[in-house]
Amino acid sequence: MAAPDRDTITAIATPPGKGGVGIVRISGSNLGPVLDALLGRPPRPRYAEFRHFLDADGRAIDSGIALYFPAPRSFTGENVLELHGHGGPVVLDLLLRRTLQLGCRLARPGEFSERAYLNGKLDLAQAEAIADLIDSSTEESARSAQRSLQGEFSAHIHHLQECLVRLRTYVEAAIDFSDEDIDLLDDATLGHEITGLLDELDTIDTKAHQGALLREGLTTVIAGRPNVGKSSLLNALAGRDLAIVTEIPGTTRDLLRESLQVGGLPLHIVDTAGLRDSEDPIEREGIRRARDALANADCILLVCDARHTEAGDALPADLPETIPLIRIFNKIDLTGAPASLTVERETTVIHLSARTGEGVDLLRQEIIRRAGYKKGTEGVFSARRRHLDAIRRARAAVANARLYLHTKTAELLAEELRAAQKALGEITGEFTNEDLLNRIFSSFCLGK
């Protein structure tokens, strides 16, 4: 792990624009000259003191609260100064420029959190949870991010790593005593522990999957032929008029994106142009974009007109078969048929009316079910795709280890356990390369 920079960094920690309060944050190993020049004298550590923030001539740029946190008991583990002044962009810019005059460097996005990680104040999963908490779009996603920030996810990972260390110690002993008349791999306890570890990995995978859904949401693409009610369905799911609805085929020519909640699950809906052959170059471009959106969907809603049951597949033939598809027969208000949900050849079929709303709740429930989301699941923490990948690689390695235990191949068993431990270490940052760190922290906002 690289040592943190020793220079002093500064940034505005509040969002751009006007507000009642604006904050400038400073962190570094030597803040003495900055404290003297900006405040006249250092404030008492961990006390909120009203101060004037001074320019180079000793005149007040602004007045407000100064908070000083000496190292190591601070967010970054370094000396930290926060200046809470008025939230106008001009006064904040003047204050920021003053800190730069005093030798501070403008912080990179996420650099305060990066220093906290590098100084051991939090691990990588907790650092990522800060960004997830800021970006959360639902109450459930905010609560799951807070659990990760408090260390619940990391505690699960550390427990699994401790189990792996114990197993590795036992297996290494079996290798060391391989020339003796002792077969430690015959101990049934070892097999029980590996099986128990697999069960725990399955449990944490389930929770991490829920957390990833809350963080990232589900990209759901509405597709179908022109004039089957795709835009009406978007409006019905959103509960308000978002898309223009007319009887003229081809009204939607570009992608229309909307984010909303369905039972606490963030849903990113994409309404697309009707899929058909067209001579109109603008409509053709919209259809091309629709096909691109379909290829990247987490779930597809294929809308058909309930009056024309033969109006079947309008989907590109080259779509991945792994993308879940829900077939929707819309406009049952024109046929007199009731709303219903059935499963035909492993495909969910829903009859509904986007205009009246009849059957739309069936669709909402099916989207949640197909996503594998369980509202109100206790102990769910924020997770990312890289976390899921690491957990699943660890599980695969432990499953291989169980096979090698049965064949009593101790060296390969030990190697698989080591690989599992390394995969889990990537989550908390114990085994992480510099490129990954740069990608993670560069996605943070300035001042965090």
Curated annotation (Swiss-Prot):
Binding site for K(+): N227, T246, I248, T251
Spans traversing the lipid bilayer: none
GO MF terms, alphabetically ordered: GTP binding; GTPase activity; metal ion binding
SS bond list: none
Residues holding GTP: 227-232, 246-252, 271-274, 353-355
Cofactor dependency: K(+)
EC number per UniProt: 3.6.-.-
Segments forming domain TrmE-type G: 217-372
Record: residues binding Mg(2+): S231, T252
CDD domains: trmE (cd04164), TrmE_N (cd14858)
Keywords: Cytoplasm, GTP-binding, Hydrolase, Magnesium, Metal-binding, Nucleotide-binding, Potassium, tRNA processing
Binding site for (6S)-5-formyl-5,6,7,8-tetrahydrofolate: R25, E82, K121, K448
Iron-sulfur keyword on record: no
PROSITE patterns in alphabetical order: G_TRME (PS51709)
Mitochondrion as UniProt keyword: no
GO CC aspect terms: cytosol
Enzyme class: hydrolase
Cofactor annotation comment: Binds 1 potassium ion per subunit.
Record localization: Cytoplasm
Main location: cytoplasm
GO biological process: tRNA methylation; tRNA wobble uridine modification
Subunit-level organization: Homodimer. Heterotetramer of two MnmE and two MnmG subunits.
Family as reported in the entry's similarity comment: Belongs to the TRAFAC class TrmE-Era-EngA-EngB-Septin-like GTPase superfamily. TrmE GTPase family.
Task of the protein: Exhibits a very high intrinsic GTPase hydrolysis rate. Involved in the addition of a carboxymethylaminomethyl (cmnm) group at the wobble position (U34) of certain tRNAs, forming tRNA-cmnm(5)s(2)U34.
Record's protein name: tRNA modification GTPase MnmE
Top-level taxonomy: Bacteria, Pseudomonadati, Pseudomonadota, Gammaproteobacteria, Methylococcales
